[in-house]
Regions:
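A short, structure-level motif marking secondary-structure boundaries and short turns
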Residues: 41-42, 68-70, 104-106
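Histidine/lysine/aspartate-rich catalytic loop segments that bind and position anionic ligands
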Residues: 49-89
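Glycine-enriched loop-and-adjacent helix/strand subsegments that border the catalytic/binding cleft
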Residues: 17-54, 59-61
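Active-site-proximal loop/helix of nucleotide/amide-processing enzymes and allied scaffolds
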Residues: 1-16, 20, 73-158
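A generic structural signal for ordered alpha-helices
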Residues: 8, 12, 31-34, 38, ...
C-alpha cells in the first residue's frame, strides 16, 4: 500500500503574462537573463557547474526557467528526463535553450558538452521541442571580451 507523500515547496513564482515575458532571440539576451535570474537562484553555486534550461514559447519569449543540475568544479550530470520535464508540464513551450557555466572561466565547450547537446537535440526532436542553443557562460573579463560560447554559433546545434 502506498503511503501519502509529503512535499516541500522550495520556490514558487507567478508565471509571467505574455506582456511580461522577455524576448530571448540571441545568445547575448540569454546570457543577460542568466546573469539577472539564474545566478540569483538560491541553489546556484558559481564554484560548481550549474545547468539551467530556459523555456520559450513560439515567439521566443521566456515562459520560465529551471535549474536542472548542480555538479562539481568540472563535471555535471544531465539527463533528458529532467531537462524536458518542466517544459512538458507547464505546456506552451515550443523550444528550450540550454545553459551552463564553467567555473574555470573558460567558456570553450568540452567534448562532453558537445555530446550532451547532441543527445538533448535528439531527445527534443522526439517530443517536438526544439533545442535552439546551448550556451556556456564563463567569467567576465576586464577588457569586456565575450565571456560565453554559443554552440549554435560554433556549428554544433543543427
Amino acid at each position: 500500500m502506498n503511503q501519502p507523500q509529503e512535499y516541500k515547496v522550495v520556490s514558487l513564482r507567478e508565471c509571467p503574462t505574455p506582456a511580461e515575458m522577455q524576448l530571448c532571440d540571441t545568445p547575448d539576451k540569454a546570457v543577460s537573463y542568466w546573469r539577472s535570474h539564474i545566478v540569483n537562484h538560491p541553489y546556484f553555486n558559481p564554484e560548481c557547474e550549474c545547468f539551467a534550461v530556459l523555456l520559450l514559447n513560439t515567439r521566443r519569449r521566456i515562459k520560465g526557467h529551471q535549474l536542472v543540475s548542480i555538479g562539481t568544479l568540472d563535471t555535471l550530470l544531465v539527463h533528458p528526463r529532467e531537462v524536458f520535464r518542466l517544459a512538458i508540464m507547464i505546456g506552451g513551450v515550443s523550444a528550450i535553450l540550454l545553459m551552463h557555466n564553467h567555473p574555470s572561466g573558460d567558456a570553450a565547450p568540452s567534448e562532453a558538452d558537445i555530446k550532451v547537446t547532441h543527445d538533448l537535440i535528439r531527445a527534443g526532436q522526439l517530443i517536438k521541442i526544439d533545442v535552439l542553443d546551448h550556451i556556456i557562460v564563463g567569467q567576465p573579463t576586464p577588457d569586456g571580451a565575450r565571456d560565453f560560447a554559443s554552440l549554435r554559433e560554433l556549428g554544433y546545434c543543427s
